[in-house]
Design a protein with these regions (language model features):
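Ribonuclease/tRNase effector modules and their secretory precursors
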Residues: 1-209
Length: 209
């Protein structure tokens, strides 16, 4: 209480937000024991109070290019699953269209190098990337081809994940990436993950192993 008394309104807001995000982080990690055994994924929080999904394995390597067919096949394992965004309570479903869109969209095929590798391997952390997402921005659907599967519009959320960087076959650090989740609000009044775009490596300090 003394800390709040000495802080200005903005600092108080940041402190409260920090503890709110920390609680979300702990809750997600505590509720996912089975998933951890199948995928080497965890959630941490950086010094700015941002939750980050740490993906510890590089499953899709590709020295020159990513084999997106392998990514597509991997994503099919999620179809039919659903996950809740902790900050909003929104339930996000994984539809049968995600594997093709995620691996074959124009955005995906425009990616090269580090960002392409990041998107491919982010597939391993999709459940957690959804669960820690924040922000919620709506836009109306104006595309005829999506008049049914996005009848009630589109939402965009922000999320973060981290991937290891190796040196001499050992993890040297983890690079952090920001990403935007594109969610379609379908005619069945359910929200579906459509794609993950705008993947960019953050210039802030990387995570040490």
């Amino acid at each position: 209480m003394e800390l709040f008394g000495e802080s200005d309104a903005e600092n108080k807001r940041r402190i409260l937000r920090y503890f709110e995000l920390l609680e979300i982080c702990n809750e997600i990690n505590d509720n996912r024991p089975a998933k951890k055994g199948q995928r080497n994924v965890s959630i941490i929080q950086n010094i700015d109070g941002n939750n980050i999904v740490v993906i510890n394995d590089i499953r899709f390597k590709g020295k020159r290019s990513i084999n997106w067919k392998d990514v597509k096949e991997y994503l099919k394992e999620y179809v039919g699953d659903f996950y809740k965004i902790a900050s909003t309570g929104d339930v996000i479903y994984i539809g049968s269209d995600l594997p093709s869109e995620y691996s074959g969209s124009e955005y995906t095929h425009s990616m090269r190098g580090t960002n392409a590798k990041a998107k491919a391997n982010a597939a391993q952390g999709i459940p957690e990337i959804i669960e820690i997402a924040i922000g919620k921005h709506y836009r109306k659907n104006n595309e005829i081809k999506h008049w049914r599967n996005a009848m009630y519009g589109w939402y965009r959320y922000d999320s973060r994940f981290a991937l290891p960087v190796y040196a001499n076959n050992e993890i040297e650090k983890y690079n952090i990436f920001h990403a935007s989740l594109i969610i379609r609000y379908s005619e069945d009044k359910k929200m579906y993950l459509y794609d993950i775009i705008d993947i960019k490596k953050e210039t802030s300090n990387p995570i040490e192993p």
